[in-house]
């Protein structure tokens, strides 16, 4: 495995992540403008990018912290870099930052059919607390709501 660095995500990462964002999240994919707006709100939001020694994007993740609650907004790992611990590393670093910002609990939503992501979150001690019916895919796919104390 190559050396993987995790760095604060910047606008420079957006162009590299957009093809993967569209491939992985389909109709729920965020736009480049959406990412730019997210990165501009540093008071409540924090984003990371995982890159290799050539600065190629391998993954990205973001969290929003308001008061004592964190919401994991996105975690993505490019297909060729999956199963190398990148998603777990990004998630752990987001939770560390959320704690630093005063959060005591974290929530997220994940597609009910995304079992790989659910396993990642369960390994990070998230537990299922509910279902949001019709949350994804224009109302055709439910979301599992997960929570953990941090």
Predicted segment positions?
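Acetyl-CoA-dependent GNAT
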Residues: 8-84, 91-97, 101, 149-150
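Short hydrophobic/aromatic beta-strand or adjacent loop that forms the aromatic wall/cage
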Residues: 44-45, 141-145
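Residue-level recognition of the GNAT/N-acetyltransferase active site
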Residues: 78, 82, 111-113, 138
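Short glycine/proline-centered loop/turn elements that form peptide/ligand docking sites
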Residues: 91, 113-117, 134-139
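Conserved GNAT acetyl-CoA-binding A-motif
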Residues: 98-109, 132
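Structural motif
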Residues: 101, 119, 123-124
């Amino acid at each position: 495995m190559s050396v993987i660095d995790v760095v604060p995500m910047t606008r420079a990462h957006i162009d590299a992540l957009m093809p993967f964002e569209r491939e992985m999240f389909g109709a729920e994919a965020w736009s480049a403008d959406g990412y730019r707006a997210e990165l501009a709100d540093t008071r409540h939001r924090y984003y990371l990018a995982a890159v290799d020694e050539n600065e190629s994007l391998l993954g990205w993740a973001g969290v929003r912290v308001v008061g004592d609650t964190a919401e994991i907004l996105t975690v993505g790992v490019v297909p060729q870099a999956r199963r190398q611990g990148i998603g777990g590393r990004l998630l752990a670093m987001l939770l560390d930052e959320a704690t630093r910002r005063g959060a005591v609990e974290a929530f997220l939503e994940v597609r009910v059919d995304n079992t790989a992501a659910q396993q990642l979150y369960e390994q990070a001690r998230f537990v299922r607390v509910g279902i949001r019916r019709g949350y994804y895919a224009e109302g055709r796919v439910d979301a599992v709501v997960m929570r953990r104390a941090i």
